[in-house]
């Protein structure tokens, strides 16, 4: 193998300038068509501009490699070259170092070292131009990162040792394209994470958000505070639901019989960081504060309000010792992780103990704070000042906007998109990751056919349909500050590497394309490429979702329901929860059935002690022949079928005749299901009174449509 230094190379400044090379490629390649029937149609993410020529290049024709890269940059790319072309290249004779003609793989970097250092934050610096002809393969880019992405495209173009004649000009849509894996609820060894980094690099992700600590256990060695891993890296049960919801949330030491868990040594972290860097992936650590910290308070109870521990998850933010602890931890984090962003969580802090804590109240009074939300904002700003003083930036979930948003903070918007847009308009960097599209721990197909998951329903098609910055919200300000998007995998119900991969792929591939490719979307074409990618990943040993046999959306969601109570007025005697209002008072008779998940906007949720109690006005006395009501059960979210369903009818709306009182004997142990209540008989009335009682106090009832006399 010959590594040739090229002294003079053309400069490629940006995507528009690079397009001129595509035009040149059209002439050189004598392109006559724009079909993508073979190699090119399977690329994920789809390149911005592809021009396909006639003919193919066999890898055996390549005589060597030429590059103007030196040192570590070429060493990092070298590992991908055999995977990109063919093993046969290694047996070709060396070429003379003085001869330029021939058939080579050329890797040409046209930028500066300074540009290479900031490439992760620039779409232009991640771009590349790839051309394949009878003269060989030429990849040009401003940075090694761009060359790396060109090689990933080249790898996807190969078929049986051949490459199509083609010209590609490409750069990402967003600079931030991330995946988050929760390693607290369940611990995943370094080798498992490396395997996912391989797939992420192949599909051009460039951020790995590492959720290292949470209520499930502390997973990172901190030398100054060894009790974090000695006492809370292991817990007494593997099953999350039993341990968290039904157990005593007890941690234990590694040597305890039945101990479950693990942690990463600092040397293991350095190893993973080097592995990620070689694939141009920045690793962003997350250290949760001030909430989600019950594992810390188990090991160091003095950091809790009142020094109490069990049942508390918030740090005492009024103690100097809390800030000193967090600064010490963050110093070790910054010594390990070179990322500009340090994620501090900031989500779902309960703040209850702060209301009565002497130290917290003193902190509020001293700083003129009126609410505990403002106290959290004050806490976040102090942590941000510390990070900024060390050249880092704070990132947090969108709850950090409550009270007061720290002046330099970046926001990760997970509760929809409004918070992210608000932050961007105020000049804060934003990463979009709304749960209804980007939470890959939710069901991806009919739940009764799937392993246990979170209660939402996020299909490949739904994820692919997401747009982080739709045209209606696009302004120069939002374009400047929405940095990209991220898919998240929370692992409460994901305990094995196989299950982790099953939830990631292929939905992560949809996010890869959303973050990279401009222009209109075509799900049918993307799905074909995803099917090809699934087969490839399975061949490489990944346990993917079976996209070939996908059931898809619930028929009631797609087709609607026609019945005699359609659009009839509903009077609510119990209140639905505002968060799960669906379509408001019209929900239960609008003919629109819900999908498989309870959060997509058609299932109405009730936690009222009365359960579900409504009256439907049929507008005239009607012969009632059948009544159908579907109730969802999702035990992981405290959603159960009703204890009983009572039906009464009335001609005038005052005196009701009971026509049914059915006890539902579905147990929570049955898992996810949609319970179909059915009544058939003969009754007459204008008003139909329906009452469904809660399975147990503080549980939820969800229903989507009350169907009377289906047509």
Q: What is the predicted function of each stretch?
A:
Residues 1-42:
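Bacterial Sec-dependent N-terminal signal peptides
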Residues 41-174, 499, 515-540:
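Contiguous, structured surface segment used for ligand recognition
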Residues 120-324, 329-341, 382, 386, ...:
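Feature activates predominantly on carbohydrate-active enzymes
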Residues 305-306, 310-407, 414-421:
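Active-site neighborhood of glycoside hydrolase catalytic domains
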Residues 394-399, 404-409, 415-560:
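Flexible, acidic glycine-rich loops studded with aromatic residues
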Residues 559-593:
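Predominantly extracellular/luminal regions of secreted and cell-surface proteins
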Residues 596-660, 671-711:
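Aromatic, loop-rich ligand-recognition surfaces of beta-strand-rich domains
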């Amino acid at each position: 193998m010959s590594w040739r230094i090229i002294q003079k190379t053309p400069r490629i400044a940006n995507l528009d300038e690079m397009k001129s090379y595509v035009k040149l490629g059209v002439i050189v390649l004598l392109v006559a068509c724009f079909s993508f029937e073979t190699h090119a149609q399977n690329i994920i993410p789809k390149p911005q501009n592809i021009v396909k020529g006639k003919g193919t290049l066999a890898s055996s024709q390549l005589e060597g490699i030429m590059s103007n890269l030196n040192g570590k940059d070429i060493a990092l790319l070298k590992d991908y070259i055999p995977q990109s072309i063919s093993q046969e290249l290694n047996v070709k004779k060396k070429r003379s170092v003085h001869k330029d003609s021939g058939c080579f793989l050329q890797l040409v970097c046209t930028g500066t070292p300074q540009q290479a250092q900031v490439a992760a934050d620039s779409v232009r610096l991640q771009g590349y131009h790839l051309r394949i002809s009878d003269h060989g393969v030429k990849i040009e880019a401003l940075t090694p990162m761009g060359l790396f992405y060109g090689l990933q495209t080249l790898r996807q173009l190969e078929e049986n040792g051949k490459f199509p004649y083609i010209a590609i000009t490409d750069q990402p849509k967003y600079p931030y394209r991330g995946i988050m894996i929760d390693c607290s609820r369940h611990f995943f060894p370094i080798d498992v994470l490396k395997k996912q980094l391989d797939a992420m690099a192949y599909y051009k992700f460039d951020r790995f958000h590492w959720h290292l600590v949470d209520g499930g256990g502390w997973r990172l060695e901190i030398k100054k505070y060894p009790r974090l891993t000695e006492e809370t890296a292991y817990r007494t049960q593997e099953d999350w639901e039993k341990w968290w919801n039904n157990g005593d949330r007890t941690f234990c030491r590694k040597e305890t019989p039945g101990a479950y868990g693990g942690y990463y040594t600092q040397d293991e972290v350095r190893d993973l960081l080097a592995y990620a860097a070689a694939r141009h992936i920045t690793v962003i650590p997350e250290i949760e504060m001030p909430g989600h910290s019950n594992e810390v308070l188990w090991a160091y109870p003095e950091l809790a309000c009142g020094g109490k521990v069990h049942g508390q998850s918030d740090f005492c933010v009024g103690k100097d010792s809390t800030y000193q602890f967090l600064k010490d931890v963050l110093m070790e984090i910054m010594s390990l992780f070179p990322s500009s962003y340090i994620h501090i969580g900031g989500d779902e802090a309960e703040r209850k103990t702060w209301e009565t804590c002497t130290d917290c109240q003193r902190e509020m009074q001293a700083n003129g704070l009126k609410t505990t939300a403002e106290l959290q904002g004050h806490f976040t700003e102090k942590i941000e000042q510390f990070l900024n003083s060390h050249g880092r930036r704070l990132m947090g979930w969108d709850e950090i906007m409550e009270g007061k948003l720290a002046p330099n903070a970046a926001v990760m918007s997970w509760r929809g998109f409004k918070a992210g847009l608000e932050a961007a308009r105020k000049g804060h960097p934003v990463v979009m990751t709304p749960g209804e599209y980007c939470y890959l721990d939710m069901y991806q197909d009919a739940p009764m056919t799937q392993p246990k998951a979170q209660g939402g329903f996020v299909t490949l098609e739904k994820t692919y349909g997401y747009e982080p910055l739709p045209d209606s919200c696009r302004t120069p300000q939002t374009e400047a500050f929405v940095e990209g998007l991220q898919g998240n995998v929370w692992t409460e119900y994901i305990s094995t590497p196989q299950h982790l991969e099953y939830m990631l792929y292929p939905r992560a591939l949809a996010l890869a394309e959303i973050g990279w490719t401009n222009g209109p979307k075509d799900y049918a074409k993307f799905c074909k490429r995803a099917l090809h990618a699934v087969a490839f990943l399975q061949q490489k040993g990944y346990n993917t979702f079976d996209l070939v046999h996908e059931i898809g959306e619930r028929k009631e969601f797609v087709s609607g329901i026609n019945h005699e109570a359609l659009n009839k007025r509903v009077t609510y005697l119990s209140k639905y929860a505002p968060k799960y209002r669906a379509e408001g008072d019209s929900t239960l008779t609008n003919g629109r059935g819900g999908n498989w998940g309870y959060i997509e906007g058609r299932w109405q949720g009730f936690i009222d002690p009365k359960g579900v109690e409504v009256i439907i006005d049929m507008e005239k006395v009607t012969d009632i022949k059948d009544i159908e009501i579907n109730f969802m059960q999702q035990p992981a979210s405290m959603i159960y079928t009703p204890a009983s369903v009572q039906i009464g009818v009335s001609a005038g709306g005052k005196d009701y005749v009971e026509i049914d009182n059915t006890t539902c004997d579905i147990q929570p142990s049955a898992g996810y299901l949609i319970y179909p209540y059915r009544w058939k008989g003969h009754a007459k009335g204008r008003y139909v009174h329906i009452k469904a009682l809660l399975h147990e106090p503080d549980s939820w009832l969800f229903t989507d449509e009350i169907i009377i006399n289906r047509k």
